[in-house]
Amino acid sequence: IVPHAYGDEDQRFTHVVNASDVEALYGSTGSGADDILEKMSFIHIDSNMVPYISPEEYESYHEQYVKSGRKTWSTTDAWKQRYTFSGKYGANLMEEVARYAVVAAQVARDLEGQFDVIHAHDWLTYYAGIAAKRVSGKPLVVHMHATEYDRSGENVNTQVYAIERAGMHAADRVIAVSNLTRNIVINRYGVPAEKIVTVHNAVRFAQNSGKVPERGVTDKVVTFLGRITYQKGPDYFVEAAAKVLKRIPDVRFVMAGSGDMMNHVIRRVARLGIADRFHFTGFLRGEDVHKMFQLSDVYVMPSVSEPFGISPLEAMRSNVPVIISKQSGVAEVLDYAVK
């Protein structure tokens, strides 16, 4: 079940359900998500000013509202409703998380007897996993790819932390992507050690294909690829670059990605006087990522805390040596890397 499907997903081995297409039972009639909904307060105000939706969407929502004949909504009522999920982070993220749980419960009810295990990935889906488990009685496995402590340090979002904790305690088994993550789950979330198993991430080492892109420069290229956020340590990459350039001037540094620290990093590069040696590509995906690795001489992952970090494996797949943070899960499986 995904919040937003595009319709071109490979479904040869997986049945993809678009949550936006599901009519879900909403209300306290055993939906499986009742207590989750009780924790959320939605106040609907009639207004001509509606943020972030198009006029067409507004007309559609208004038509549904008029047809329902409702002036107020109560959790003691039950009716079927279809939700539109953005599939993006936004101001109404927590509302989408709660509604996603309602949809997951409905799907679990509709597919009764057709599945054996519920597998929920990261906190956005944990309430959905809990709701599906309550409806179906099937075992719940939650997959912890990153904790709130990885993303935010000690300044955790208490709402996110609470959802993570609830999901892991409700689960029959917790999968951690590294022993580093496993220890955080035990010590910070109070999850019993015997409940958690470590399964490291991996990449498929397929034969490299396609023409190697022309570099256009003779300088060595050092690459950072990932979200430009606190967790990924982009500022350490910049400071290290400044030190390298004092000793070896014919090096270029590439920061491939986007994130909330991007403007801060750009300003820091300018203040250090190394802008002529720095390149910002923006967010890369698919084949562009592969090309970036092909153009690189060294890949650096300076993460402050990295639950796993699959990009060094992707770099090594392109025969690029890597320098990685010791505070990473991938450091547990890489013997041939500078740490």
Label the model's feature ranges:
Residues 264-284:
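Nucleotide-activated donor-binding/catalytic signature segment of Leloir-type glycosyltransferases, i.e.
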Residues 97-103, 136-141, 149-166, 205:
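Nucleotide-sugar donor phosphate/pyrophosphate-binding loop at the beta->alpha transition
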Residues 175, 215-241, 254:
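Conserved donor-binding/catalytic core segment of Leloir-type glycosyltransferases
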Residues 304:
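Aromatic "clamp/platform" in nucleotide-sugar-dependent glycosyltransferases that forms part
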Residues 2-108:
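A conserved catalytic-core segment of Leloir-type glycosyltransferases
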Residues 321-324:
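Short hydrophobic beta-strand element within catalytic cores of glycosyltransferases
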Residues 283-284, 291-296:
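Short alpha-helical donor nucleotide-sugar binding micro-motif in glycosyltransferases
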Residues 180, 202:
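Carbohydrate-associated surface elements
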